[in-house]
């Protein structure tokens, strides 16, 4: 991502953002609501086009070819209310050539989800577990998870974080957007702080602890209190 700007008239959703993520990293994209996190993710998936700047995934310009490399879990469910869990799995298997049905069923068991359950009766936490299962069961190079623990209880959060660590492909990278930093910082290798459409910090988690003597959550509070 090189010098990306996304504007709507005179309002900038992203302003001259440059970012490079290496393979094998779990990266936290941290910011308050409206900071530009979701816009950035949608641009990497190709759902939004930049006003200016260039975007690539493993060297490929973002477009039709790069979409096969990116698995996106948006902040709204990808499933329909009429579906059962098995219908959602079947839909993804038929739609994505890289969908691993064996991995999906293993994750369902880990998540304590039944294939016969109706999507419409799943709790918020169970629904998020299903969405994560669908996203991580693809053999992608980049996984984008938009607020995967937002609005779920602490038990569900723990299960979701454990699943991310257990099932993500270590040759790939994951970008996780969130504002719930304390609950999730334990799984991050790097963090990116975004505020008002601009990146204000990109740092390895260990460096934050050594250089600043702070947790990621403490640094987040400091940056956003300014």
Each language-model region and where it sits:
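ABC-family P-loop ATPase nucleotide-binding domains
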Residues: 75-130
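Helix-to-loop junction immediately C-terminal to a conserved catalytic motif
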Residues: 45
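ABC ATPase "signature
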Residues: 202-203
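The feature captures the beta-strand-to-loop junction immediately N-terminal to the Walker
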Residues: 30-32
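Catalytic Walker B motif of ABC-type/P-loop ATPase nucleotide-binding domains
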Residues: 143-147, 152
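Conserved ABC transporter NBD signature motif
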Residues: 52-66
